[in-house]
């Protein structure tokens, strides 16, 4: 009996209820599965392939209907699937459920995923549980189809008191949970799924992109219209700009290259090495160079070499400082065999800055391995007893010692603004390094002559040590060329440096800094290394020696006058070598014979880094202080500053490899664009998702609907001014500007009488709102036949309205009917005859009409008088004659005002949105806004005084222009042309 009821309740084929649809889909799936089991697939591969395709389609269909049933029965009790947010877009397809079911059956049968044997073994128990649970759900749903199906019902009608219904409910919950777990495991094994950290890093990348876009909008690199229009070019510009901003502007953000590689976002992890190199080069750019690079990344235009770069830009070294890489090894061998000294004693001129320039130039030669070319450019080589103000000199080579190993990048507050230090060595005025009381003893402090240097040539180890000394060894103080630097003269509590891009307002630097640096650079041929040293050390922050109680804080006491004051004595710089024995793990302090009279001590650290002090101390306290410093350990501040200088050395050395700033910017553009463009290929899904979020966050509010008025109001006319070129070219340098041109508007003619005298007072009337400017001409009309001087005159005022240019009117006007046009033309002809009579009768009289004719004659030079040119020529020619007939004058109407561009974001014909490439075009006949395709027609408009062909839309061309160009239109145009000739 129960079987008979089931047969009677079997769903029909046309039943659209959920249970009926599941019943038929399940039967079809069972039939395909039975057919697959009935033959050997290896014997008939084609048939097997077709059946497998049908099987997967039926599985998709069954699971889709099952999902709908679970949505209705379980509702909020369904297992969450928030993990799908981490899946790539190409994985989230409609047939994902069918693929998962097919994969679960394969794994349950003993198969393994290719190259995923370990994951397959781990997922096999879960796959077996999924297939078993799904089989149980299918059986229970088939039973419900035969018992509780309501034909064509949109909802399920199950018996809640039945045990099978409760069993179905629990089975669906179990299957939903197992299937969700299997989905996450299977997809994670097949494709790379982001972890929680990686997903958060991708969100931070999105924040970086958004901040980059807002910064680009603020400094004018991009336009808001491009964001609102979803300009495709932004898909390339934003990632490029984000790389620059992430490496320099937001150095502690998601593109912080100092963090471990596994903590970087997977999008930029493959490019970590090249990004570090890009970051080092970007830190050598000043603000203007950085702006040029960002503009180049946005527009792909050529670098504008005519625009002067910032004052901190480094030029290529002079040819005398350049070295050929192929000869470096041979030069090193020659230097070691000939025992040539790496740095020689140089007697400089009286100016300390000249000493500095040549010293650093010699260091550049040393970096380029030009040891054979010693700097002998001193002006007085035989001067004896010169004072040595800075006996310590640092090598330029950043790769010769272990101290130049890659160091963590400084924080943004200690970052390097424009260029990094190449070398530090100088001879400065006495106020820098000694007290005023000891100035008389400076000549006897240290005596250096050529014999001292010749004696040192015998020591090969000392020569090697001179090559190995780097600028990073100087930790507590610097010997800085051109110490007349504003930042170094500030107190220690004042920061010496800002962020790389502290603010967009300080984009190009101040003119005072550039002028100050120009005064400092007295020698024209200043080397690039000297500029690098000066500007980098100007940015570096000297660490406070709080951890050293016996060492007073480092200070520099000097004034600007002392910095720029000539020494008066010739100075010599002598290299002071330090010996570093790594094998015995101790340090030997190589001292000069006269070193006890040096005004600054040397301190040796445990790590082998030498530290130079800028302290001004008495000679009696130098020796105990040196001993105390030798006993004290190294501090973290010294190590940090040593890393800063080491990083500065590497950065400047890398920049000096480029021939020019343009070459550096071009190389950076190629590298940055290459990385950003590879993101489009390797991480297309993630990049699209990030850019979509960025666009939605930064787009402006929804624009208002287009409000096109049905009838033009004269108060809504816009004022448009002609360009300067139009005034210059067409006015031919006339003193009468284009704004003096006037045109009569018959639609606004309101004639009214005013009490007269011998002369009517002229008044000017301006009708309209703030966006319109109307010019009026006061006209005097005689009453009767009396003379203009004796008879009473009635002054009539006609409003004269003229648009400021032929192509810039913005409001919409509906075309008037043919009868209204004829009536207006007749009125205008009558008014024209009356005006001409008045002007002929008032020739030579002192009336407003003469002023009117004067203004009209001056208007002939206006470039926009083409509409009423024939009428104005008739007025000037017929100054003493009456026109023969009224038909010889052409009646012109006021052209329609144009719709503003802001109120027309789409074409009014095809509704296509306007973009940066799809421009707006206005129809001269109706004033509407159209694209170039919908307004490609052109025709003359005699009714507006436009005898030449102008742009009109297609509708106006078909409906009005062609229909209106009948016999009257042709005769009107011919008459206008004849009168003009």
Curated annotation (Swiss-Prot):
Q: Which residues bind Zn(2+) 1?
A: 907, 910, 931, 934
Function noted in UniProt: Negative regulator of epidermal growth factor receptor (EGFR) signaling.
Renumbered residue ranges of the record's region Disordered: 308-462, 561-642, 749-897
Where are the FYVE-type Zn fingers located? 901-961
Stretches with biased composition (Acidic residues):
434-462
Q: Which SUPFAM superfamilies match?
A: FYVE/PHD zinc finger (SSF57903)
Instruction: Output the Gene Ontology terms for molecular function.
Output: zinc ion binding
PANTHER family from the UniProt entry: LATERAL SIGNALING TARGET PROTEIN 2 HOMOLOG
Q: Which family does it belong to?
A: Belongs to the lst-2 family.
CDD domains xrefs? FYVE_LST2
Binding sites annotated in the UniProt record for Zn(2+) 2: 923, 926, 953, 956
Q: What is this protein called?
A: Lateral signaling target protein 2 homolog
Q: Report the source organism.
A: Drosophila erecta
The record's keywords, sorted A to Z, are: Metal-binding, Phosphoprotein, Zinc, Zinc-finger
Question: Where is the sequence biased in composition, kind Low complexity?
Answer: 326-356, 369-380, 390-404, 412-433, 630-642, 811-866, 883-896
Q: Where is the composition biased (Polar residues)?
A: 760-791
Phosphoserine modification, residue list = 544-545, 805
Q: Name one Pfam family in it.
A: FYVE
Q: Where is the composition biased (Basic residues)?
A: 576-611
